């Protein structure tokens, strides 16, 4: 091929930029080497003979020179460099402090020489030297001066060069082009450009393609280029400026919607696009050209001999292999290795003919680089079943003080597809020590001794999932899952997984065991997070929320990691004192769904109140108080005129609260009875959710009388409201106002403190239907509005909701526990310790079965008691065993309320208990002067008497109360089965 002589026009001033780096030893490990930082870009200068008036060459050339110097590019492609520019512009740039050499290629010269309608590779001479230069034309005969296809009016082409960084000796390959306007010409020229890049860069040096390519991201020629290079706009860590690059010399151009036709592509291991800039700066209020300069700050590192990169500090280290695998995830303090060198992501997409098509990284080609404390893995192209897809994946792994952050960016350019799911990071074949137990925040918290056995259980509906491949535990944040984290907790160390995502988008906690094909056993553990981008062609999705922390110490360290993140968005007001002092409530249905009266308004201040007082309970959670009855007629809630209507109810509430009680008034926050006046008015169908076919989503509640007809055939049917719909908000506001006007001390909205696992709202207007994956955020916004409406007007007017998801309960004064959690894996310690300020109840104790154990759990964990006898059909007096034991428990709570009710839950910290068989917790009073230690014998099986000695350093025992046959002698507690004792310690003076 012909080579042109290098023509240099030098300037004297030096502009210090991110391109100059001192030399370094190539023998050093990659993490210790000096990186090469370089700014590479493109700038179409616009022919000097085209502009008029203020855009004439004589008036804009100074602006253009200033723009070149101000951008400070180390290397850039200049397009439309005509003879007048070539004669004047370099000197103008020099005079303003530039120091550039301009290597031009004119497609109108047989040798490519000269400056007639030329393009140029421009580089700083104090930073780089040019080692070679090549050029070719856009035609069927690219080595001859020619034009081709449907663009014969102009001659087009490309030029390329190898540049050596003077300080470090590193070499890079740069190709510059001004693509044709003709569609056919662009489509044919793109593969020529790729082929010549391969030919002229046989060593596969870091490679860059820059220029005005006269195309769009979604066009086929761009897809061809992305088969070889990566588009820095799609892959850069940071984007500055506008999406559009062509301003059409009009300051009124909407640059965010203007065409993006100027591109900076890159390729190569060790190359990181840190910052993409479209510079829209104006000079004297005008653009210097009809294109904006575009440049990218790159960091280039040498690739280590084994192709892997490692980041480490004193706490944690992570290593990524040359194939993008997670080679190591290590606790540096203990030496525990958790990774096994497996891949760390999966992707699923839909096409028009198939759904949930799996993409695995093991069959992809990756590019890996490191910059500072961040490793980046690029996948410029995705392959599935031998077919290439125009989708890009970027993974950024960075090290923080106590954790590793796993960020990701997805770009979909494949027509008629949507990226549905991205599973990342994945810790496959996890190396878990035998003492590590699996923690999830399901129902407030569960702890499983054997992760493999727990996850490996076959589902209740076998093989609906491909359980011949893996077994999975379904854990979705917000859907009965209180926190967006889980962990593997050992005695002295553990592994914390957190999705620190303040968008509160749908997130699954990936808990799987895969089948080992060599043994047939399901014992290959995998942990991670699953997100749902729904990324259509032409869209980018990003997430930087997911972290993994190999921590040292007890699980309280992991709790601190989560709480530190929570504090960045937590917005919980001071809870009304009456709520904090509430020990229990009676939850009672007055009129049931099918019309039966269980209680009347007159009973509120009669047997209902008397029953509550018998156990020290002064709160009533009132259900079914309206004419239609419980779970019927929502959201009409018609006054029950047969009992005197709202006036009679208001009078009964006033009398109840005058006796020192508190009434909590119930509404459902989302269900719309399809027989209600609200629904039949036409509004209901407008505000309700729709599924992936556009049909209404329905829920049914199968309460029955004593026959079978209701439950089997005649259930009530409800539509489900869309949260944050303005009309539905107004409904909730009016219900809240009505509760306040009735004199209730609290309004409660059922089903607003969590999200459902399936019944989200779908948008069916796009090529593929899309679900709303931000249900938590919308519920949170709704609850915040409800809270704030009465925050100043009536600060003691409390707001409650069912469910205790952290992002939602921050706006509530209390929550009703959902779902019930009373099995052997119950372990709400983590949630309770992380959120000691939250007031929430238990659930599920409905009769006289297993009462002491259940009630003891609520005292140990600082929960309030939800008295829901016979699922709210009865009152506590109907269950004498429960009544008797709860009376003892509430007396203890009242006696030690400064610690148990108003103090801070402190778990097992601050004291010692000599017997690990005894369940023990501590609560510290607000003044820090007293600590209550709760101890209980919760051992099931054959009854045994056990004892423990409790010591609190710097404190002395001053008081104690017990249930059952428990005894306290000194600091020793002796406990029969399901006995409990509370021991109060006071700080020694």
Predicted regions and their residues:
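Polysaccharide-binding surfaces and accessory modules of carbohydrate-active proteins
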Residues: 306-311, 316-317, 329, 334-384, ...
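Active-site-adjacent "subsite" loops/lids of carbohydrate-active enzymes
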Residues: 665, 669-742
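Acidic/histidine-rich helix-loop elements
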Residues: 42-61, 139-154, 180
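Structured beta-strand-rich core segments of catalytic domains in phosphoester-bond hydrolases
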Residues: 79-171, 277-278
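N-terminal, active-site-proximal structural segment of metallo-dependent hydrolase catalytic domains
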Residues: 2, 6-7, 14, 21-93, ...
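An acidic-aromatic substrate-binding cleft motif
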Residues: 41, 550-629
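Metal-dependent phosphoester-hydrolase catalytic domains
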Residues: 26-28, 127, 198-208, 215-304
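Active-site-proximal substrate-binding groove within the catalytic cores of carbohydrate-active enzymes
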Residues: 539-545, 735, 775-963, 975-985
């Amino acid at each position: 091929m012909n080579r042109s002589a290098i023509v240099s026009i030098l300037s004297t001033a030096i502009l210090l930029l991110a391109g100059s780096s001192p030399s370094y030893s190539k023998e050093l490990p990659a993490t210790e080497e000096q990186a090469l930082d370089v700014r590479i870009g493109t700038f179409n200068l616009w022919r000097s003979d085209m502009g008029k008036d203020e855009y004439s060459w004589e008036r804009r050339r100074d602006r253009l020179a200033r723009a070149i110097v101000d951008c400070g590019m180390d290397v850039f492609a200049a397009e439309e460099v005509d003879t007048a520019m070539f004669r004047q512009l370099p000197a103008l740039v020099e005079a303003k402090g530039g120091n550039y050499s301009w290597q031009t290629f004119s497609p109108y010269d047989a040798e490519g020489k000269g400056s007639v309608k030329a393009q140029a590779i421009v580089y700083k001479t104090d930073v780089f030297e040019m080692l070679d230069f090549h050029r070719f034309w856009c035609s069927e005969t690219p080595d001859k001066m020619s034009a081709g296809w449907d663009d014969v009016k102009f001659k087009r082409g490309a030029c390329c060069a190898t540049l050596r960084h003077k300080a470090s000796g590193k070499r890079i390959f740069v190709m510059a082009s001004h693509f044709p306007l003709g569609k056919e010409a662009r489509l044919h020229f793109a593969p020529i450009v790729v082929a010549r890049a391969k030919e002229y860069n046989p060593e596969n040096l870091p490679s860059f393609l820059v220029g005005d390519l006269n195309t769009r991201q979604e066009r086929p020629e761009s897809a061809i280029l992305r088969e070889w290079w990566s588009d820095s706009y799609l892959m850069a860590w940071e984007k500055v400026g506008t999406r559009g690059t062509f301003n059409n010399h009009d300051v009124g151009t909407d640059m965010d919607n203007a065409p993006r036709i100027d591109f900076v592509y890159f390729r190569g291991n060790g190359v990181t696009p840190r910052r993409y800039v479209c510079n829209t700066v104006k000079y004297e209020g005008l653009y210097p050209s009809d294109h904006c300069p575009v440049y990218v700050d790159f960091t280039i590192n040498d690739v280590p001999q084994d192709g892997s990169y490692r980041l480490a500090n004193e706490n944690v280290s992570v290593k990524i292999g040359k194939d993008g695998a997670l080679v190591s995830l290590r606790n540096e303090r203990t030496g525990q290795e958790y990774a096994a060198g497996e891949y760390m992501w999966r992707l699923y997409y839909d096409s028009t003919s198939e759904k949930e098509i799996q993409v695995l990284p093991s069959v992809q080609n990756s590019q890996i680089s490191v910059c500072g404390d961040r490793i980046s893995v690029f996948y410029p192209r995705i392959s599935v079943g031998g077919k290439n897809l125009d989708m890009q994946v970027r993974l950024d792994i960075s090290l923080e003080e106590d954790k590793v952050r796993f960020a990701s960016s997805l770009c979909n350019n494949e027509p008629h597809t949507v990226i549905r799911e991205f599973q990342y990071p994945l810790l496959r074949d996890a190396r878990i020590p035998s003492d590590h137990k699996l923690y999830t925040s399901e129902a407030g918290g569960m702890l499983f001794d054997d992760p493999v056995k727990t996850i490996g259980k076959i589902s209740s509906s076998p093989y609906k999932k491909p359980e011949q491949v893996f077994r999975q535990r379904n854990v979705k944040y917000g859907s009965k899952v209180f926190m967006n984290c889980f962990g593997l907790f050992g005695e002295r160390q553990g592994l914390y997984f957190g999705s620190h995502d303040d968008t509160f988008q749908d997130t699954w906690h990936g808990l799987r065991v895969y089948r080992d094909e060599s043994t047939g056993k399901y014992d290959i553990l995998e942990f991670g997070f699953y997100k749902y981008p729904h990324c259509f062609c032409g869209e980018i999705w990003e997430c930087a929320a997911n972290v993994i922390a190999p921590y040292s110490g007890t699980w309280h360290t992991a709790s601190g990691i989560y709480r530190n993140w929570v504090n960045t968005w937590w917005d919980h007001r001071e809870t009304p004192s009456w709520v904090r002092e509430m020990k229990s409530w009676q939850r009672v249905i007055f009129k049931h769904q099918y019309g039966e009266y269980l209680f009347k308004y007159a009973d509120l201040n009669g047997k209902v109140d008397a029953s509550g007082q018998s156990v020290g309970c002064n709160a009533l959670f009132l259900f079914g108080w309206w004419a239609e009855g419980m779970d019927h007629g929502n959201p009409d809630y018609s006054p029950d005129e047969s009992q005197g209507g709202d006036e009679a109810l208001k009078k009964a509430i006033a009398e109840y609260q005058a006796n020192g009680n508190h009434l909590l008034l119930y509404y459902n926050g989302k269900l719309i009875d399809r027989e209600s006046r609200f629904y039949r008015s036409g509004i209901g169908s407008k505000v309700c959710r729709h599924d992936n076919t556009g049909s209404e989503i329905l829920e049914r509640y199968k309460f029955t009388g004593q026959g079978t007809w209701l439950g089997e055939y005649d259930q009530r049917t409800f539509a489900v409201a869309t949260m944050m719909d303005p009309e539905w908000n107004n409904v909730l506001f009016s219900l809240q106002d009505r509760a306040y006007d009735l004199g209730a001390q609290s309004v409660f909205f059922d089903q607003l403190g969590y999200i459902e696992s399936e019944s989200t709202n779908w948008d069916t207007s796009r090529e593929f239907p899309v679900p709303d994956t931000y249900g938590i955020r919308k519920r949170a916004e709704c609850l915040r509005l409800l809270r704030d409406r009465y925050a100043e007007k009536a600060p003691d007017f409390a707001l409650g909701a069912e469910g205790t998801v952290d992002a939602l309960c921050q706006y509530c004064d209390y929550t009703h526990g959902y779902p019930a959690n009373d099995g052997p894996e119950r372990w709400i310690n983590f949630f309770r310790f992380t959120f000691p300020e939250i007031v929430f109840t238990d659930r599920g104790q409905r009769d006289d079965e297993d009462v002491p154990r259940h009630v003891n759990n609520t005292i140990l964990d600082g929960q309030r008691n939800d008295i829901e006898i016979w699922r709210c059909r009865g009152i506590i007096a109907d269950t004498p065993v429960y009544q008797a034991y709860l009376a003892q428990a509430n007396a203890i709570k009242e006696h030690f309320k400064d610690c148990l009710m108003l103090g801070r839950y402190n778990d097992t910290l601050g004291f010692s208990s000599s017997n690990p068989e005894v369940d023990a917790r501590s609560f510290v009073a607000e003044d820090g002067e007293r600590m209550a230690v709760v101890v209980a014998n919760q051992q099931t099986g054959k009854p045994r008497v056990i004892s423990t000695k409790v010591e609190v350093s710097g404190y002395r025992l001053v008081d104690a109360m017990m249930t059952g046959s428990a005894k306290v002698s000194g600091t020793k507690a002796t406990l029969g089965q399901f006995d409990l004792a509370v021991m109060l310690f006071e700080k020694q003076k």
